[in-house]
């Protein structure tokens, strides 16, 4: 399939590459050959920070120049400048109250041979552990007839994440580790809940492996999960905080 000339996408990638080079990020990638040179696939990614979409594109672009169409919340598309960039890069807007259009657009993109990036946790996990996943990645793969590729990122949350202000100098020289797992085949006959639960187990196992080989000790650090000696919230505390935040938003919207 001949690739389109997409100047906005290429410009955005160039800016990202320049920024990550300026920060002197130390990238380690395993399993990148699992990302096909052509054909559709769902990239199901961990979500511990706000820059994983750009970081994963950084890794895939360096490998084979594949462009990823990310599912992003409608609120981002509603912003004047950001929204224009997202549309220009052909990302997919998701209305959390009515996601049918996004699902249809994603299936169409996958069938056309695109890579579609999704965060099945449906939000940043501030415990820095993989929380319960939504079934969207499995459903998309089954309907479009493409595989799911699990993608784990560790270290990217040290650049920008939820509930923690990262200092300017803290971003320099941060190691960022990536793992691209073996493609998972999903058929319409499969139980998508079971596939999704297995995907969660796989992603957490991949994160565990990245943490074991991470070149910086994180004991006592805000970015390390509590079970490894860090000071991040426990999964239960993170869920409770998210629920309270949602209650406040709902109350303000009334």
Predicted segments with their positions:
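Helix-to-loop junction immediately C-terminal to a conserved catalytic motif
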Residues: 9, 16-47
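Short acidic-hydrophobic, aromatic-tinged amphipathic segments that line or gate anion-handling sites
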Residues: 29-30, 92-95, 186
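Catalytic core of membrane glycerolipid acyltransferases/transacylases, capturing the structured
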Residues: 37-98
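Hydrophobic/aromatic ligand-binding patch that stacks against planar heteroaromatic rings
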Residues: 85, 108, 139-143
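A charged, well-structured terminal subsegment
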Residues: 104-112, 174-209
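Catalytic-site beta-strand/loop segments enriched in glycine and acidic/polar residues
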Residues: 109-138
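A cross-family acyltransferase "interaction/gating" segment
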Residues: 128-194, 220-226, 233-234
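Acidic, Ser/Thr-rich low-complexity intrinsically disordered segments
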Residues: 222-254
């Amino acid at each position: 399939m001949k690739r389109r000339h997409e100047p906005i996408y290429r410009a955005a990638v160039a800016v990202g590459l320049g920024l990550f080079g300026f920060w002197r990020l130390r990238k380690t990638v395993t399993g990148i050959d699992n990302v096909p040179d052509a054909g559709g696939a769902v990239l199901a990614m961990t979500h511990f920070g706000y820059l994983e979409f750009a970081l994963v594109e950084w890794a895939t672009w360096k490998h084979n120049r594949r462009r990823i169409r990310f599912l992003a919340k409608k609120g981002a598309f509603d912003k004047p400048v950001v929204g224009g960039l997202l549309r220009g890069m052909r990302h997919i807007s998701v209305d959390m109250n009515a996601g049918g259009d996004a699902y249809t657009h994603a299936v169409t993109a996958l069938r056309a041979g695109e890579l579609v990036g999704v965060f099945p946790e449906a939000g940043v996990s501030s415990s820095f552990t993989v929380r319960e996943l939504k079934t969207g990645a499995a459903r998309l793969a089954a309907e479009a007839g493409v595989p799911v590729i699990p993608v784990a990122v560790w270290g990217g949350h040290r650049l920008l994440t939820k509930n923690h202000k990262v200092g300017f100098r803290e971003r320099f020289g941060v190691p960022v580790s990536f793992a691209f797992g073996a493609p998972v085949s999903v058929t319409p006959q499969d139980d998508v809940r079971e596939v999704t639960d297995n995907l969660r187990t796989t992603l957490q196992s991949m994160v565990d492996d990245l943490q074991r080989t991470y070149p910086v000790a994180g004991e006592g650090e805000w970015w390390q999960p509590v079970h490894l000696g860090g000071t991040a919230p426990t999964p239960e505390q993170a869920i409770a905080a998210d629920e309270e935040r949602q209650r406040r938003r709902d109350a303000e919207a009334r």
